[in-house]
Regions:
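Short beta-strand/loop segment that forms part of the nucleotide-sugar
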Residues: 30-38, 60-62, 88
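Cell-envelope/extracellular polymer assembly enzymes that use nucleotide-activated donors
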Residues: 5-7, 31
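Internal alpha-helical transmembrane segments
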Residues: 85-86, 90-91
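Catalytic-site signature of metal-activated, phosphate-bearing donor transferases
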Residues: 68-75, 82, 93-187
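Short, well-formed alpha-helical segments that are part of the catalytic scaffolds
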Residues: 10-28
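A conserved acidic beta->alpha catalytic loop
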Residues: 17, 25, 36-46, 87
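Catalytic phosphate/metal-binding cores of nucleic-acid and nucleotide-processing enzymes, i.e., regions
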Residues: 10-13, 38, 63-69
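Conserved donor nucleotide-binding strand/loop of the catalytic core
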Residues: 44-77
């Protein structure tokens, strides 16, 4: 698939630690829509610097209305029909990018990528953390996200053709025990 025909949708809030690496992995896509939720760190500066170099990023802003609703709002800003939804703490591996380029998608295709969840930079291969498949590529005229406030996911219609990629996203999930406890308490 031509990556220029895919809009990448990213939600961000205070993502300065991972955003540059995330965006760099997405530079070949036709459009990146970044939906900011009141970042107070250098997130927007990083995004603007990226856009100066690649000219394919658009910044929108919204209050927090729940993750499902925010992701659907972000998708609504996308100019392309095909969507790659990625989190600001995820990085698309080169092998996964090559696999996406080789796809021949029909409108009813929904694509899952495995995530390599990382703890303090190390890949967690046990405890059900890999493969952690997440539905991330879809045609916005076919489906979208559920409206869950947290733990949102792409709705999979019965007539969807499901495709699982062999390659993955690196997910910088947590970097300390403190961040694990913070996430557990938040969600």
């Amino acid at each position: 698939m031509d990556t220029k025909k895919i809009s990448v949708c990213i939600l961000v809030k205070n993502a300065q630690n991972t955003l540059a690496q995330c965006l760099e992995s997405l530079r070949e896509f036709g459009e990146i829509v970044l939906l900011d939720n009141n970042s107070t760190d250098k997130t927007l500066q990083i995004a603007q610097e990226f856009n100066t170099a690649y000219k394919n990023l658009r910044i929108e802003k919204s209050e927090f209305i729940g993750f499902g609703a925010l992701k659907n709002l972000c998708v609504s800003y996308a100019k392309n029909e095909w969507i790659l939804s990625i989190d600001s703490d995820e990085v698309l591996e080169n092998e996964a990018l090559s696999e996406i380029k080789a796809l021949d998608l029909k409108q009813n295709c929904v694509v899952a990528l495995g995530r390599k969840n990382l703890y303090d930079g190390e890949w967690i291969k046990a405890c059900g953390w890999y493969p952690d498949f997440v539905w991330r590529i879809f045609n916005k005229n076919f489906t979208g996200f559920n409206d869950n406030f947290v733990h949102e996911s792409v709705k999979i219609p019965q007539n969807a053709e499901k495709i699982y990629l062999k390659n993955a996203l690196k997910h910088y999930a947590v970097n300390s025990m403190e961040s694990i406890i913070t996430k557990m308490n938040r969600y």
